[in-house]
């Protein structure tokens, strides 16, 4: 796992960008984006909320390949709950499996649960280390 500071969107189109997500849906069945990278992604790609909503409705709150070099990484059950270290650990394993089966070579992940979620990086980092090899860059937004 590589760690660096920077703007995750400077890698758009070059790497798979991972969006931290939750399992909440609107009445219309669209995913509820949190703040940060996921909100920015929905602003750039409005189709994300509908597609992710369909996937959550069909398969639950899991890691998904959204296409267009975007993937999801659940960190909490709902948009109103706190990030859960157990969900983050499960998502790390699922993302590694998806990266392996998809042949992804460069994956950018924001620090899960550490921005608006309030978790400390020193508590989250050990959950990612067993799963994230040198294809994974965890980026701390500047």
Where are these regions (language model features)?
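Macrodomain-like recognition of ADP-ribose-binding/processing modules
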Residues: 1-142
């Amino acid at each position: 796992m590589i760690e660096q500071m920077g703007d995750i969107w400077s890698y758009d189109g070059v790497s798979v960008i991972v969006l931290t997500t939750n399992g909440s849906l609107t009445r219309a069945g669209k995913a509820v984006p949190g703040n940060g990278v996921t909100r920015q992604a929905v602003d750039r790609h409005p189709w994300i909320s509908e597609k992710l909503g369909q996937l959550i409705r069909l398969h639950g709150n899991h890691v998904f390949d959204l296409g267009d070099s975007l993937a999801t990484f659940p960190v909490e059950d709902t948009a109103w709950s706190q990030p859960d270290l157990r969900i983050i650990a499960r998502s790390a394993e699922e993302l590694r499996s998806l990266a392996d089966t998809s042949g992804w070579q460069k994956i950018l992940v924001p620090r899960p649960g550490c921005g608006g979620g309030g978790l400390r990086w020193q508590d989250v980092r050990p959950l990612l280390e067993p799963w994230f090899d040198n294809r994974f860059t965890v980026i701390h937004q500047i």
